[in-house]
């Protein structure tokens, strides 16, 4: 019951604390194209994460599950939206259902709603090979997310305090998983060094989960008597983390998440090097406050606006969008320069 209560607390506090919007995309400017040689009606948005083909560079990221009827209903509605727009979708951590079989229904509902959808299972880095297999089987998942959430755990009153052996555990899961493994952060971003470590053990897809969206340090601090306020602004901003990712020159697929709310955010993330983008808190807020039809409409508008932006840039495909010129400035440029990452290739391509 403690874990289920925590799931409901996370929804409540995630909605009340809001999105920080410190994702860094304001430091990214596209180079305007007066002769784009493009046609809105022929723009295509298909993309890939590793070997997984997606119809859209937008998917519904991990949010919830394991909190009884309320989380079942949320996942049911999100699965309907995913089916309507043919989007991939991830569930929240399934450890709750592995510990308590009665919670499995809140995850299994997505496959009932959308039998042919692309779904990602989700577990923390403490998971064993056997738990990973059970999580995948539970929802007949197409991929497995392993989330890294050190700062959330440290801020969580009942959270983990021992993070030894994590890389080795992930490696075992990667070597034994029957589906692709995506390693993701939960809002604190990833450094190039972390991504190089993950690539070295065979990980082929990473969700950088940058700072700028739902702040799980702030969420957990709401549940504490004594706040660890020094963690509230901890992390690497989303835009910065994407560039850190692409600077590794590894054969990795990258998912951009962390405060992404607009088609312009999506376009900038992809132009920086992401293969696709993921929405979580923003979609949850619309669903909970305005209803499912409003969320369906919002995703329609996101796709329309993304195609407008791609038309303006002369990018006919997502692959071409990854090659349009842009300028990195401000704090993002300063951070990357200090980290020894050259950004001039973005502006000169």
Swiss-Prot record:
FMN binds at residues 62-64, 93, 122, 184, 214, 258-259, 280-281. Homooctamer. Dimer of tetramers. NCBIfam families: IPP_isom_2. Involved in the biosynthesis of isoprenoids. Catalyzes the 1,3-allylic rearrangement of the homoallylic substrate isopentenyl (IPP) to its allylic isomer, dimethylallyl diphosphate (DMAPP). GO terms for molecular function: FMN binding; isopentenyl-diphosphate delta-isomerase activity; magnesium ion binding; NADPH binding; oxidoreductase activity. GO terms for cellular component: cytoplasm. Gene3D superfamilies: Aldolase class I. Its EC number is 5.3.3.2. It is an enzyme of class 5 (isomerase). It catalyses: isopentenyl diphosphate = dimethylallyl diphosphate. This is Isopentenyl-diphosphate delta-isomerase.
